[in-house]
């Protein structure tokens, strides 16, 4: 039976997990998701309303509904990656199917003078989907895992990396790898993560002490024995460079739950409020293979890190829609920051073909809860309705990612990086819908055709950035049959990102040119 140990220690700056600003940034952005009608117009719904996903852009939009409705959306994602790593190219493809959206809204007509309608609604959306985010790449690097573990080990006394406890040149206690790895969790600050990595590299032989020995013999002099224990410099035990293969397998996502209230005043003003709950559940498995020259004592190595991240958050939105003229609609929305609380666990595994073949501590490291705040945003919207037959709509959103902030003083270095690396962004969405009336007996139904474009600016200040600008196009169609509406959409977007295996030493960038494809099907029914 596999033994599991749970321990807690402080935040570590070396971690490649969501405890650095890059992954906090990932949780601060949202994918374009929602109903097929919404997606078919690239989400340009801030001044239109009357759609479940429009509520997530402008909460005033629920009072545009003429009656109670319920609807849900199923969809699929296809991600294609063209990856270049140190001159070697790879092509990946990943797919996923999911429930993208579910909503219900209840508008209530009132006879009160001036205030004509109150509306209550709920909408769920999958705002970030990690299930179609797997990728892998290979290539040749001038540095390898030997360099990586040497970086952590240098400066640590070898006596802290040995399983044996010596006294008077005699072994008085033999510990297990799990015991030592577990006990290192009591070290403060970043030392726990540093010591653990050094322990793994030393245990499997990827690094060796500069003195050349890691055990004491009874015949050693006191000076020699002390030199072995006090050694703080290490050499990598493999040849320079490596053929590398890296794979990331991730699952989960970010969900948002809108609890909505809105009202209509006279025939020209709509006001709304959203109280939003956010939930994050992500699992990451990072696998790293290396092959070295045949002249090396160690010819291959495998390093694995698994992360489990969970979080919850709260935000709110205030919105308004104004009928400026018979056809012109104007909208504005303020979206507050999202206040998140996170917890995270991870495990490590390392193996080589040398002496002790593998290091499997079988310890689940539980990090302390931490908090961060995403930036808020402002959205301005405009739409023109050509009677019942066409809509032209546009949204503009401003967000300043310098306002992303970690709440703990232990993460001040991350806040400094945010201040230096991130900046202001603009997002533009444009959509059009045309409606073709179809006479069916005495009823008139409609076939709708839709198209849209969106641009999302990179949150990074520099031109060559880990996250690039995104450009996307969408198309859609729908049909109303009495109180039933069926919609479908297809969206495609392109973006170039940079990915590093680790935050230190092995930092060569893999350039990932991604094409995201998404198709959705929405069923909506009038309740009463």
Predicted regions and their residues:
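Short, linear, compositionally biased motifs with a strong N-terminal bias
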Residues: 10-11, 66
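N-terminal signal peptide c-region/cleavage motif recognized by signal peptidases
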Residues: 13-15
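Asp/Glu-centered strand-loop micro-motifs enriched in Gly/Pro and often flanked by an aromatic residue
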Residues: 39-54, 91, 244-250
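Short amphipathic alpha-helices and their capping/turn segments at secondary-structure boundaries
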Residues: 60-61, 265
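Outer-membrane beta-barrel porins/channels
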Residues: 19-33, 38, 105-528
């Amino acid at each position: 039976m596999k033994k599991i140990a749970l321990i807690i220690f402080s935040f570590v700056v070396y971690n490649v997990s969501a405890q650095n600003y890059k992954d906090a940034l990932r949780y601060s952005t949202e994918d374009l998701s929602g109903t097929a009608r919404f997606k078919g117009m690239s989400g340009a719904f801030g001044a239109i309303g009357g759609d479940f996903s429009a509520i997530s852009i402008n909460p005033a939009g629920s009072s545009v509904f003429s009656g109670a409705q319920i609807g849900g959306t199923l969809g699929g994602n296809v991600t294609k990656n063209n990856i270049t790593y140190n001159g070697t190219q790879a092509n990946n493809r990943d797919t996923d199917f999911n429930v993208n959206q579910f909503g219900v809204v209840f508008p209530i007509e009132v006879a009160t003078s001036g205030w004509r309608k109150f509306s209550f609604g709920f909408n769920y959306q999958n705002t970030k989907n990690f299930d179609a985010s797997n990728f892998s790449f290979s290539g040749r690097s001038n540095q390898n895992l030997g360099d990586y573990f040497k970086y952590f080990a240098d400066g640590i006394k070898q006596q802290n990396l040995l399983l044996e406890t010596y006294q008077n040149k005699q072994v008085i206690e033999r510990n297990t790898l799990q015991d030592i790895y577990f006990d290192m969790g009591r070290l403060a600050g970043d030392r726990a993560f540093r010591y653990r990595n050094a322990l793994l590299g030393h245990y499997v032989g990827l690094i060796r002490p500069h003195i050349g020995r890691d055990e004491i013999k009874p015949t050693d002099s006191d000076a020699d024995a002390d030199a072995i224990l006090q050694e703080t410099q290490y050499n990598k035990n493999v040849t320079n460079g490596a053929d590398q293969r890296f794979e990331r397998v991730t699952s989960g996502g970010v969900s948002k739950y809108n609890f909505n209230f809105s009202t209509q005043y006279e025939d020209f003003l709509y006001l709304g409020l959203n109280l939003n709950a956010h939930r994050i559940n992500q699992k990451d498995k990072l696998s790293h293979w290396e092959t070295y020259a045949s002249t090396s004592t160690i010819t291959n190595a495998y390093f694995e890190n698994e992360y489990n991240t969970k979080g919850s958050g709260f935000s709110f939105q205030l919105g308004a829609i104004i009928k400026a003229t018979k056809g012109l609609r104007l909208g504005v929305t303020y979206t507050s920051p999202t206040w998140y609380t996170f917890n995270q666990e991870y495990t490590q595994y390392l193996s080589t073909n040398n002496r002790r073949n593998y290091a499997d501590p079988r310890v689940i490291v539980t990090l302390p809860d931490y908090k961060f705040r995403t930036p808020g945003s402002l959205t301005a919207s405009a739409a023109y309705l050509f009677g019942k037959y066409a809509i032209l709509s546009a949204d503009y959103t401003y967000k300043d990612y310098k306002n992303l902030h970690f709440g703990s003083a232990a993460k001040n270095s991350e806040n400094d990086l945010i201040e230096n690396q991130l900046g202001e962004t603009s997002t533009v969405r444009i959509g059009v819908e045309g409606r073709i009336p179809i006479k069916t007996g005495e009823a008139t139904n409609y076939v709708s055709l839709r198209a849209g474009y969106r641009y999302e600016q990179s949150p990074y200040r520099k031109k060559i950035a880990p996250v690039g600008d995104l450009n996307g196009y969408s198309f859609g169609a729908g049909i109303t049959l009495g109180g039933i509406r069926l919609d479908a959409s297809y969206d495609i977007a392109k973006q170039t990102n940079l990915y590093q295996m680790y935050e230190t030493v092995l930092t060569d960038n893999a350039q990932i040119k991604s094409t995201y494809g998404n198709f959705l099907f929405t069923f909506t029914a009038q309740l009463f």
